Amino acid sequence: MRIVVAHNRYREAQPSGENTIVDSEIAQLTAAGVEVLPFIRSSDEIPSMSKAAKALLPISPIWAPRAQHDLSRLLTEHRPDALHLHNPYPLLSPWVVRTAHRHGVPVVQTVHNYRQVCSSGIYFRDGVICQDCKGRALGVPAIKHRCYRDSAAQSALMATTLAVHRGTWRSVDRYIALTSAIADHLREYGIPDERIVVKPNSVPDPGQPAPLGDGFLYMARLSPEKGVDLLLDAWRRHPVGALGTLRVAGDGELRPLVEAAAAERPDVVYLGQLDRAGVRAAVEASAVVIAASMWHDVLPTVIIEALASGRPVLGTALGGIPYLVGADAPHEPAGTGPAEVASAVAGGGSGSGGSAMPAGIGLGEAGWVVAPEPAALAAALPVAQAGAPLLAPTARARYERTFHPDVVTKQLINIYANLPQTPRNP
């Protein structure tokens, strides 16, 4: 099997989980015996481009002629079984779908964000969820609010690109939705069920989990959409020390809020930006990982890392978070799903304290979800603290069954193998 993996890498100065996932997926496919032909561009190339190449940048999101020429040559020479597209912006363009189809090559796309509709890709503006461009032929609100790179001109270009390529996106042969929430987004966009497959990302297996640590870990970009201010508000509603330690890892514009909270309360510890070893140590030191996103977060990798280490997750009920903790679907193996765990907790299972689940807290196989509100999160913190020992084994089991690299890679190869022989036309 021969697969072209196409991706426009985000700038290295802007840490990107998507870049990491693409690199990992290429390595896993190669290890599984798939011949991978990377077709990679990087936004870091832009400053060193020639004047002529820079002159074409404004049209690159729509067409990107150099990329189409190079891709045509690659497809002609190697005749791959499929093209797997990740991010096309700005140097590849969605036009690569048309180029692949012109060569008779079917296209798979992994959907990492909401940029079929939303120019910023995250459905979030000015501190709140925004879906003003849904259902519009042209995303005029995105232009008005400078949603793409805080530029009216660049927002106009992106909104135009999305309008021009609506037919292109609807011609993709198979969409990989990272969670059930992304699958719903694609259905709303007009993609039929038979062209959507839910396949999450994976993280490497860290091995059998260490014993549960103490308290909570929040690990994310310190920006408004990731909800660190929501978490700190909820945390302050409990006496100092009542919930153990809150460890916060990451960096971003809201770092001063975290540093102030750490100076104010001895039960808040700011860890800064961590490397891989630091991430593992922080996860192992904690009992519960928190994902407090205020937007429809597609697939926070920190949740999969938590499950791999046998740590249940307390998250907001937005985007892919309910799917990740198993709170959005029927249970799988008997005795391990949300219904069984809920029954065990309500009946006084280990770590439950013997009390019923409070209203407003959704219980999943591997964690809890609540509304993105301070009072709701504050109410769930002691529930998660008490219930962590019960959910820790099922958190690890969910990782092994759903997010382990071997499972996910096999699923991806099956997606390639079941593509239609004749690609669609836009």
Where in this protein do the model-derived segments appear?
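Short alpha-helical donor nucleotide-sugar binding micro-motif in glycosyltransferases
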Residues: 75, 273-274, 282-286
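Nucleotide-activated donor-binding/catalytic signature segment of Leloir-type glycosyltransferases, i.e.
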Residues: 256-278
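Short hydrophobic beta-strand element within catalytic cores of glycosyltransferases
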Residues: 312-315
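Donor nucleotide-sugar binding/catalytic pocket of nucleotide-sugar-dependent glycosyltransferases
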Residues: 116, 131, 135-207
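A short, well-ordered alpha-helix in the C-terminal region of glycosyltransferases
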Residues: 389-402, 411
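A conserved mid-protein helix/loop that constitutes part of the nucleotide-sugar donor-binding site
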Residues: 20, 214, 218-237, 253-257
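Short alpha-helical segment that forms part of, or immediately flanks, the ligand-binding pocket
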Residues: 280, 303-308, 319-326
